[in-house]
A protein has these predicted regions:
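Conserved beta-strand segments of alpha/beta enzyme cores
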Residues: 11, 63-65, 152, 218-220
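Conserved N-terminal catalytic core of the sugar/cofactor nucleotidyltransferase
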Residues: 13-14, 18-93, 99-104
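Short, conserved catalytic or adaptor-binding loops enriched in Gly and charged residues
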Residues: 54-61, 114, 145-148, 211-214
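Conserved beta-strand termini and adjacent loop/short-helix elements that scaffold enzyme active sites
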Residues: 67-69, 124-125, 159, 222-224
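Conserved core of the sugar-phosphate nucleotidyltransferase
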Residues: 101-189, 193
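Conserved alpha/beta core of the MobA/IspD/sugar-nucleotide pyrophosphorylase nucleotidyltransferase superfamily
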Residues: 156, 165, 172-247
């Protein structure tokens, strides 16, 4: 990604004239979310400036704040930065390097819909096929069964050695989790519990947290309508610049 970003925060890379982060903020606003916390790593002052200008603007959430994840320690650790911001409410998590196009409904709204119906933690899932695997990141395959828009996840494999892109593991297609979630307020305590079980120095990722949710029967998948674009990869970013138009 450095070959494209060239020192720019990747969250601010332009797609159809707007930063990647802006597309996700607009998606949140279209989904009815008025309060957003953007978690950033140290030294990304440009993101803070962008957020200050964007908050309350046309098509943007009314309140957008930033908080710093002091060191890169995994997605679950980044989620935990938002504990005080979320209070005792469920929290939506949307990763800016995952975009969705050609959907009848924003991806954030879709996972919220499934949460409202199931009252469970929700992870967005999508189908990966051979023609797009090389432009999607190396997330694990989720075995399970689809029921309408729901996806009953059988298991979530732990992260092991992997390449730089998605592996179908010989299958013609496979389901995987992508960067749209709803977590119940209890997820923050669960993240703390999972952290205590990790080996020293091990990253506090979302996978072991969702594995614990699945074991407790409190996690469900939502099959997301629309085309998933992984702009965290150069190939995915180029695809997104060709397909995304400002709405």
């Amino acid at each position: 990604m450095l070959s494209i970003a060239r020192g720019m925060a990747k969250e601010l890379l332009p797609i159809a004239g707007e930063p990647v982060l802006g597309h996700v903020l607009r998606e949140c606003a279209r989904s009815g979310i008025t309060d957003v916390l953007v978690v950033v790593s140290p030294g990304k002052d440009a993101i803070d400036a962008y957020v200050r200008d964007a908050a309350g603007g046309f098509g943007m959430p009314a309140r957008i704040e930033t908080a710093i994840q002091s060191r890169p320690h995994g997605l679950a650790d980044a989620v935990r930065v938002g504990r005080a911001f979320a209070g005792n409410e469920p929290v939506v998590v949307a990763l800016p390097d995952n975009l969705f196009v050609d959907a009848q409904q924003p991806a954030v709204a879709q996972v919220i819909e499934t949460f409202a119906r199931s009252r469970k933690n929700v992870v967005g899932v999508t189908r990966i096929t051979p023609d797009i695997a090389a432009s999607r990141g190396p997330t694990p395959v989720y075995p399970g069964a689809r029921r309408g828009d729901d996806f009953d996840i059988e298991s979530i494999p732990s992260k092991g050695a992997h390449g730089s892109t998605f592996s179908l593991e010989g299958a013609r297609s496979a389901m995987t989790g992508v960067g749209r979630y709803v977590f119940l307020s209890g997820a923050f305590d669960l993240i703390d519990t999972v952290e205590r079980s990790l080996a020293s120095g091990q990253e506090l990722d979302d996978i072991p947290v969702m594995q614990s949710m699945l074991a407790r029967g409190t996690l469900i998948g939502r099959v997301l309508d629309g085309t998933f674009l992984d702009v965290g990869l150069p190939e995915g970013y180029r695809e997104a610049t060709e397909r995304v138009a400002i709405r």
